[in-house]
Amino acid sequence: MVIRYKKLIFVDTNDNCRAPMAEMILKRKFLTNPLTIESRGMVVLFPEPLNPKAEAVLTSNGYPQPSHIAMQLEQEDINNDVLILTMEDKQKSQIWETYENAPHVYTVKEYVGENGDIPSLHGQPLTVYSQCYTELELLMRKLVTRLNEEEEL
């Protein structure tokens, strides 16, 4: 049985870099089934804006004035028609340990048939942010293919 997700949430540590970049990239892709796309963090102490390096990389890739405010993943974000994709395996485990009824939690790479994590960018130079953007762009293409193929079933 194919699950028809109504929402997809990307999750990273504090929702100011990798997850919002993935969200913004995916929102520009064509999905055959309308899907609400959001991002959240595991540890959001206050609603901070997008990381300046992530913002610079997005701007240089044609996202004019990307804006984002970090939000904490909450129990009410999670239900049976929500697909949650984490950047790292430890975040997936944290969600299973912290939240109830989280049946559809995968890492981004796991969901598209790859192994490994999308590593944290904390303290990294702009070039590493750019490399992460390129990796996320490729992963989002694979994700679109998977989501659209599931819609056809």
Task: Label every model-predicted segment.
Residues 1-80, 145-153:
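Conserved active-site segments centered on acidic
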Residues 89, 93-153:
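Phosphate-binding/catalytic loops
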